[in-house]
């Protein structure tokens, strides 16, 4: 029985640091509270997030010579940094690995920086493919 105690403790601690899957209305509320609706149409953004990450914070995708991270699928190609020494040169000033946890506060800050650029949602391929029209299903 004593040998199971360390495994039990690991099982209790690990879920607190693991990723989270959000629902569309939960995300809608969080994004609205953080003022993202002042920057971009939430149905368009939520559709793009769904088709990019499935609303999962742990999504990590290899995309040719860079990776995309987290619920917003933020690219290591200039937006976030894969190495600590590159953080200051990245637009969002964050390690990409920090975009994979269940706290999406820093993800939202980074996404807002990207969304305020002229290309806005066009930085995400899923937006052009799936989220330009018929967005009623993404309302809450």
Curated annotation (Swiss-Prot):
Residues 20-140 form the C-type lysozyme domain. The keyword Secreted applies. Lactose synthase (LS) is a heterodimer of a catalytic component, beta1,4-galactosyltransferase (beta4Gal-T1) and a regulatory component, alpha-lactalbumin (LA). One of its GO terms (biological process) is lactose biosynthetic process. It is found in: Secreted. Ca(2+) binds at residues 98, 101, 103, 106-107. SMART domains: LYZ1 (SM00263). This is Alpha-lactalbumin. Keywords: Calcium, Disulfide bond, Lactose biosynthesis, Metal-binding, Milk protein, Secreted, Signal. Regulatory subunit of lactose synthase, changes the substrate specificity of galactosyltransferase in the mammary gland making glucose a good acceptor substrate for this enzyme. This enables LS to synthesize lactose, the major carbohydrate component of milk. In other tissues, galactosyltransferase transfers galactose onto the N-acetylglucosamine of the oligosaccharide chains in glycoproteins. It comes from Trichosurus vulpecula. Belongs to the glycosyl hydrolase 22 family. One of its GO terms (molecular function) is lysozyme activity. The gene is LALBA.
């Amino acid at each position: 029985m004593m040998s199971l105690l360390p495994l039990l403790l690991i099982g209790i601690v690990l879920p607190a640091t693991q990723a989270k899957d959000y629902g569309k209305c939960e995300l809608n509320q969080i994004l609205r509270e953080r003022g993202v609706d002042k920057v971009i149409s939430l149905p368009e953004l939520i559709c793009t997030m769904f088709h990019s990450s499935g609303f999962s914070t742990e999504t990590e995708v290899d995309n040719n010579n860079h990776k995309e991270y987290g619920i917003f699928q933020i690219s290591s190609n200039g937006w976030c940094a894969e190495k600590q020494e590159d953080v200051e040169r990245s637009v969002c000033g964050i390690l990409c690995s920090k975009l994979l946890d269940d706290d999406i506060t820093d993800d939202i800050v980074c996404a807002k920086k990207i969304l305020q650029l002229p290309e806005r949602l066009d930085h995400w391929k899923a937006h052009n493919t799936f989220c330009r029209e018929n967005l009623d299903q993404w309302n809450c």
